[in-house]
Amino acid sequence: LDISRIPFSRFGSYFAVSIERDTNRLIVRDLHGGDEAPSSIFVLELMKHGQAADFDLDVTETRLRIIHRHNHAEYAELCISGEDIIYCRIAGASLKLTAVKTRYDSLMPYGPQQWEYHLYSKEIKLMFTLLQGDARIQAPWKMVGNDSIELVMNPDGDQDEGCVFVIESYKTVWRKKEYEDYARACERVDRHYEQWLRQMPAVPERYEPSRRLAAYITWSCVVHPEGQLNNYAMYMSKNWMFNIWSWDNCFNAMMLSERDPKLALAQLDIFMAHQDESGIYADFINDKFLSFNCCKPPIHAWAFARMRERNAWFDDRAIVARMYDSLARATNYWLGYRRPSASWLPVYNHGNDSGWDNASIFHDGIPVEAPDLAAHLIRQMDILSGMAAELERADEAKAWTEKADELYGLLMDRLYRDGRFVARYAPEDRIIAHQDSLILYMPLIIGYRLPSEVTAALANGLAERFEAQYGLCTESYHSPLYRDNGYWLGPIWAPVTYLFIDALRRNGYNEFASRLAAKFMDLTLAGGMAENFDPFSGKGLVDPAFTWTSSVFLMLARESIQPPEEHHEKIFR
C-alpha cells in the first residue's frame, strides 16, 4: 500500500497512519471529530544512535513496517490489532513519537511502564504501555500542559526484538487487561481482513487488483459505534472526508447487502436514527456531530429496493415497514418544505443538496428547480406506493401514485423544452442557459414513465455528448465549462455512473450499460478508487481512496459475472 494515498487503518478503528502530503512526514492520526477536526496526533521517526535514519515503508493491509534503508534488519513494525489498540514491535533501532499537540494536551506517568496522554482537542485519552524493552520520555511541563512531548521507544536501539509497546484509545478510564504477544495480536487482524476479503464478490481475473484495493478501502474505512454513530459506519474515506454522507452511504449499503445485510442496513439506519422532525436526513454524520446545513438527493428508496433485489433478508416485514415510514417522512420533507408553490417542483437550495456541488446548473444562483430531483422523487414515490401496497396500506399506496403522477406532469410541463430537459432558476422562474450538465439527463431513471422517444433521446444524448474514453463526463466535453479536473464539471464519478447504468439496463439499453460498466472497471485499473477521474486519461483525482467508488466497482464487477435477479421489479412500478 502507498500510504501517501491510501491510509493504513482497519475495520472499526479511528486510528490511521498516513504520509502527510505537505511535509512527507509519517503520521499517526485519530479520526474522532470528523473531517473538520485536525487528525494528526504523532509524528513517527525511525532513529539510530540518536539520529533520524533514512527509512522505507513496507505496508500490507494489516502490517506497516518502517525499515532502515541501509539495514533491513533494523525496523519498527506496527499493526492495528483491535479497533482501539495499536501494537508496535521494534528491532535494532529506536522509534520516536513526537506529539502534534495543542495547549492543554498532557502526558503523565500512570503505572509501571505506562503513560497516559490526554488529547483535549480530540476528547480522547491514549495509554502507552511498554510490554518489553525500554523507553525514554521527554515531556517538559509548562503551567497548563507539556511544552512538548517526545517518546523514544527502544532508545538504545541495539537489541534484536528489543521493544514491544501498545497504544490504546478510550474516552474516560483505562481498563486493565492481559495483553497478547505481538504475533498473536497481528494474526487476529489478519484473520478479520481475510474474512472480509473472502466476502467480497468474485470478479473477472484481470480486475483482481482492483478487487483487492476496493476490499481494503471498504474494510479499513469503517469506524465503530461512538457518540452520534449508533452503529458501525463506513466513512467515505480516511484521508480527508472522514464522515458518512447521506447518499454515499446508499452505494456502500447496496454493495454490502448481499454478504453483510446487517452492516448494509446500518448504513441507512445511522441516518434514520437522527432523522429530523421535518423528515430530512442529515447531510453527514460523524461520532461528534451531524450537519443539516445541506442534504442529499432522495435516492434512498431506490437503494433499499436494490438491496432487496440482492438479498431477501431485507424482505422482513418489520424492516420494510420501518424503512417505509422513514422514507415516507423523508419524501414529505421535499414536498412540504422545498416546494415554493403547488405549481412548482421541489427545489435545491444549494448545489450540495444535489450531491453535484458545482454542476453548471447552479452557476446562476439558488434555489434551482432541477429535473434530477423531480425524477428521484417520482421514482421514490412509485417505490413507496409499492411498499405501501405490500404493507396493506391501500390508501397510502394510491396517494403516493397520485403524488408521483402530479410531479411527473409538472416535470414535463416546466422542465422539458424542445426535446430536452432543462433546469430553472427559481427566483426569476427562468430556464437556466447552461444545458450541458449530465445531471439534466437523470430523468432516464424514470424511463418507465417517459414516452419511448424521450427515453431514446436521453440515451442517445449520453452517447453523443457525454461518453468519453472511460465513461460519462459530468459536464459535456463539448461545453465551454468542461474541465478535466473540475469536480462536477467534467470528471467521471462512480455514483452517477451506477445510476445511469442501472437506468439504461432497466430501459433495455443493455449493450450501452455493459459498455459503460466495462469502461468503469477499466478506469479503476488506471486511476484506482479515487473520488473522481479524468474522463480521457483515467487519472484518479482529489481523494485517491474513496469507498463509494470501491463499492460501485465491486457491484459492477459482480454484475458482469452474475446480473442481479430482479425479483422485486414490481416495486419500481
Task: Give, region by region, the residue ranges found by the protein language model.
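Short N-terminal helix-initiation segments at or just after the protein's N-terminus
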Residues: M108, E180-Q199, W240-N249, Q380-M387, ...
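Short alpha-helical segments and helix-capping/turn motifs at coil-helix boundaries
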Residues: D147-E150, C250-F251, E428
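Extended glycan-interaction surfaces of carbohydrate-active proteins
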Residues: V203-M241, Q267-D287, R339-E369, G409-I492, ...
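Aromatic-rich carbohydrate-recognition surfaces in CAZymes
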Residues: F242-S354, A370-A374, I378, P491-N507, ...
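Extended, well-ordered alpha-helical scaffold segments
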Residues: E178-R188, H192, R206-L213, D260-A273, ...
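The feature captures the catalytic groove of carbohydrate-active enzymes
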Residues: N154-E178, S278, D283-I299, D315, ...
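Terminal accessory carbohydrate-recognition/targeting modules of carbohydrate-active enzymes
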Residues: L1-R206, R506, V542, T547, ...
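Contiguous N-terminal and early-domain "leader" segments and peripheral loops that mark the onset or edge
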Residues: Y75-L107, V223-L265
